[in-house]
Design a protein with these regions (language model features):
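Conserved glycine-rich cofactor-binding loop
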Residues: 11-12
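Short alpha-helical oligomerization interface
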Residues: 90-102
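Active-site loop of short-chain dehydrogenase/reductase
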Residues: 75-76, 119-125
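Hydrophobic positions on the long internal alpha-helix
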Residues: 80, 111-115
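Conserved NAD(P)H cofactor-binding loop of Rossmann-fold oxidoreductase domains
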Residues: 82-88
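Conserved glycine-rich Rossmann-like NAD(P)H-binding loop of the short-chain dehydrogenase/reductase
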Residues: 25-40
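Rossmann-fold cofactor-recognition segment
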Residues: 46-61
């Protein structure tokens, strides 16, 4: 039976390669990222298995986007949070550090907390 997988941050690198592995395994894959053209490129390659949702985890509508993707997939079995940034802040520039915190901490906590509760309610995941 095919899993329903969401990968947060799947437009390049590890996230994209994980998406391809799950697709090869026959799973349904929801991919997210900030670069819509890269999301659509993957969806065009595998239209029967890939759904997309373009958003930045630093935004205020993470849960709305996640719920939309879960609806498109018809459920959720696996979530992979692969979004992260790491810029050098030589002068301890708060604006730069704020972006890192919003992505690596706030976005992670919001999405993983929602997903944990979703899995607990459905009894698996």
């Amino acid at each position: 039976m095919a899993n329903k997988v969401i990968i947060i941050g799947a437009t390049s690198g590890i996230g994209l390669e994980l998406a391809k592995l799950y697709i090869k395994n026959g799973d349904m894959v929801g991919v997210t990222g900030r670069r819509n053209e890269l999301l659509l490129k993957l969806q065009l390659q595998f239209p029967a298995q890939v759904v997309t949702e373009c958003f930045d985890v630093r935004g205020n509508e993470n849960i709305l986007h996640l719920e939309s993707l879960i609806k498109k997939l018809g459920g959720l079995d696996i979530l992979i949070y692969n979004s992260g940034v790491g810029d050098i802040s030589k002068e301890l520039d708060w604006q730069l550090d704020k972006q890192t915190t919003q992505t690596n901490v706030n976005g992670f906590i919001e999405i993983v907390n929602y997903t944990f509760n979703y899995f607990a309610k459905q009894g698996h995941g």
